[in-house]
Each structure stands twice: as structure tokens, then as C-alpha cells.
């Protein structure tokens, strides 16, 4: 089965996002339990398409792409802060816009 792919801009460069669990074939050193991977030198992001983790994994790997100097712990902290903030974001603003809500 072919993986779904999209192209997104990051830092004025085109990055390919591949929705499949990363494997050793994709990048040497991938661990079996990895659900995402950012390969900066190839401008590729791999994201396991599992519905329970796809959004957080996508966000996590994009943070790695945008801020390659950050440690894994810092990326996790950023990911959690952003997801928590969006969890509290008023749904009516998302659906109707600020002026209509």
C-alpha cells in the first residue's frame, strides 16, 4: 500500500511529510517503537498515521524541523504546551471566527 504524502513549507524550503511508520529502510538507526522521524538533510518527515498519535507526532516532528538545535526534551515540552493550549482553545472561534463567536 502506498503511503500518503504531502509537501509543506518549513523555513522557506519544501519538506515532504510521509504518513507511514518510519523503518530502518527509511533511515538507519530508527528504533522499532519510533512513531515519527525528522530527516533534516533530506527534508523529510515520517509520521505514523495512527489516529491516536498522528497530530501530536506531526507537531513533534515539525518542531524538530523548525528548531533542530532543541533537545528531545525541549521538543516534547513545546509539543505538550502547544497541544494543551489548543485543547483549551475555544471551539466556537475555530468554527465561526473571532468576530462571530
Question: What does each model-found stretch correspond to?
Answer:
Residues 1-53, 68-101:
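Metalloprotease/metallohydrolase-associated module, dominated by Zn2+-dependent proteases
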Residues 56-68:
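Active-site recognition of the HExxH zinc-binding catalytic motif
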Amino acid at each position: 500500500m502506498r503511503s500518503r504524502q504531502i509537501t509543506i513549507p518549513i523555513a522557506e524550503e519544501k519538506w515532504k511529510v510521509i504518513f507511514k511508520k518510519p523503518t530502518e529502510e527509511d533511515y538507519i538507526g530508527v528504533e522499532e517503537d519510533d512513531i515519527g522521524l525528522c530527516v533534516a538533510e533530506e527534508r523529510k518527515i515520517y509520521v505514523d498515521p495512527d489516529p491516536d498519535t498522528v497530530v501530536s507526532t506531526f507537531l513533534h516532528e515539525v518542531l524538530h524541523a523548525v528548531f533542530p538545535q532543541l533537545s528531545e526534551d525541549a521538543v516534547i515540552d513545546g509539543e505538550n504546551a502547544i497541544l494543551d493550549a489548543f485543547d483549551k482553545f475555544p471551539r466556537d472561534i475555530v468554527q465561526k471566527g473571532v468576530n462571530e463567536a
